[in-house]
Swiss-Prot record:
Highest taxon of the lineage: Bacteria
This protein's encoding gene: astD
Protein name per the record: N-succinylglutamate 5-semialdehyde dehydrogenase
PANTHER family linked: ALDEHYDE DEHYDROGENASE-RELATED (PTHR11699)
Catalytic activity, EC: 1.2.1.71
MF (Gene Ontology): succinylglutamate-semialdehyde dehydrogenase activity
Annotated metabolic or biological route of this protein: Amino-acid degradation; L-arginine degradation via AST pathway; L-glutamate and succinate from L-arginine: step 4/5
Length: 491
């Protein structure tokens, strides 16, 4: 594959952006790993207009033709998986072992998307009185895809693949923190034979994103990212019911512990839930609900003991660490400030989160006991876990639902009845039992309620927001019915 150029990609051409210069920086070494210019207003306009021009020809291709190009992209992912995994680790700081799983998820998304398209948005016919009922699905047109930095390959891919399969054209605006991953990915789409204009790449920060979101010629926007930005987009799209908006945002996710016989098994799942990807998964456990008393004390003691031994290092360290860095030194500093603010309000540190190397994104895991403390209902996107102690399961459920978010929730318990109550009473789109909260299947819907989304779940249900249904009643010719409505006379 070609070296990174720092260009935007519009109508099959790699061109310099005309906006402000910017760069992405390796979060530990400070090395510049990508530099270029943001897409200007004119660049964004050109990208949208070229996507509009390419739409009719792309949607008119058969499903098999579109699928063939997408599967060619999957083959190129396989052939270039190490290079892409390295770029993901380089820009995000996540360890290579985890970056490789991200590329594997990108490849796995393709057959799942094909299956979902056929099952949820395919073509069906049935006989009805006087003819046939036919259900078809049609693409929206030009859709904007906004990608996040935590999974810069997999998460935008989860929008792009089903959107293209359905016949849409795409303008992709990745996170300004991971532009290199986006450029490599779009180069693979180009190499796969995707026609010019079907996918376009506009790099840049909030100015570029605002230009794209407000463009009059987009038919929809698919977003994965922070609740703050998602709510701004929702406000901006108010009064535009003709445009589809799919928002997948974060959560202040609760994980309940109660009646566990395998202490280390439960501790393992709690650590995976809180600290996988350095806590930078939207489904990560942010609040750990532990019973008061001896059993809860034993669980917390073991949790802190094992968490203190978690290895943290650079993405390409050998041996590989469990955790890499967070996305930037700035993000690390914000997390440290959040920890300090909790302690100032009276919370107790069980395991102090520390910056392991000055001016880097390397943070050790942090665990804070905030029982009885009023804290802001906020998602802290990093390795910072807040513990709340409870007396009975009713209180645990009340604490679990004490959030405006509703993305994920779970319980670690041998008692199936407690899980049944959680499923019945919790408000969350993903609810797990004796599994980490960070485990989610692409063969199931992925999304939340409340401030975590707008009822447009992604993953297997992404097919739903990538196409709209057209229902038809059909007959071969017009015939006079056997019986007429009252008041009609053809004699």
């Amino acid at each position: 594959m070609a070296n990174l150029t720092g260009n935007v990609y519009i109508d099959g051409l790699w061109l310099p952006g005309h906006g402000a210069p910017f760069e992405s920086v390796q979060p530990v070494t400070g090395e510049t790993v990508w530099d270029g210019n943001a897409a200007s207003l004119e660049d964004v306009d050109a990208a949208v207009r070229e996507a509009r021009k390419a739409f009719l020809a792309w949607r008119r291709k058969s499903l098999a033709e579109r699928q063939a190009v997408i599967e060619a992209f999957g083959e190129l992912l396989e052939a270039n998986k190490e290079e892409l995994a390295h770029q993901i680790g380089l820009e995000t700081g996540k360890p290579l072992w985890e970056s490789r799983t991200e590329v594997a998820a990108m490849m796995g998304k393709i057959p799942i998307s094909v299956k979902a398209y056929n099952e949820r948005t395919g073509h069906t016919e049935s006989d009805v009185a006087g003819g046939h009922a036919v259900l078809r699905h049609r693409p929206h047109g030009v859709v904007a895809v906004f990608g996040p930095y935590n999974f810069p390959g997999h998460l935008p891919n989860g929008h792009i693949v089903p959107a293209l399969l359905a016949g849409n054209t795409v303008v992709f605006k990745p996170s300004e923190l991971t532009p290199g991953v986006a450029e490599l990915t779009v180069r693979l789409w180009e190499k796969a034979g995707l026609p010019d204009g079907v996918i376009n790449l506009v790099q840049g920060g909030s100015d570029t994103g605002k230009c794209l979101a407000r463009h009059s010629l987009i038919d929809g926007l698919f977003f994965t990212g922070s609740s703050t930005v998602g709510h701004l987009l929702h406000e901006q799209f108010g009064g535009q019911p003709e445009k589809i908006l799919a928002l997948e945002m974060g959560g202040n996710n609760p994980l309940i512990v109660q009646n566990v016989s395998d202490l280390d098994g439960a501790v393992h799942h709690a650590l995976q839930s809180a600290f996988l990807s350095a806590g930078q998964r939207c489904t990560c456990a942010r609040r750990l609900l532990v019973p008061k008393g001896k059993k809860g004390d034993e669980f917390l003691a073991r949790l802190v003991e094992v968490a203190a031994r978690i290895t943290v290092a650079e993405f390409d360290a050998d041996p590989q660490p469990f955790m890499g860095s967070v996305i930037s030194a700035e993000a690390a500093n914000q997390l440290l400030k959040a920890q300090a603010a909790m302690l100032e309000k009276g919370a107790t540190s069980l395991l102090e989160m520390k910056q392991l190397k000055p001016d880097t994104g390397l943070l050790s895991p942090g665990i804070v006991d905030a029982t009885g403390i009023e804290l802001e209902d906020q998602e802290f996107f990093g390795p910072l876990l807040t513990v709340y102690r409870y007396k009975g399961f009713d209180e645990a459920l009340e604490l679990a639902n004490n959030t405006r978010y509703g993305l994920s929730a779970g319980i670690l318990s041998d008692d199936r009845k407690l899980y049944n109550r959680l499923v019945e009473e919790v408000r969350a789109g993903i609810v797990n039992w004796n599994r980490p909260l960070t485990g989610a299947s692409s063969a199931a819907p992925f999304g939340g309620v409340g401030a975590s989304g707008n009822h447009r779940p992604s993953a297997y249900y992404a097919a739903d927001y990538c196409a709209w249904p057209m229902a038809s009643l059909e007959a071969g010719k017009s015939e006079l019915p056997d019986s007429l409505a009252p008041g009609l006379n053809f004699d």
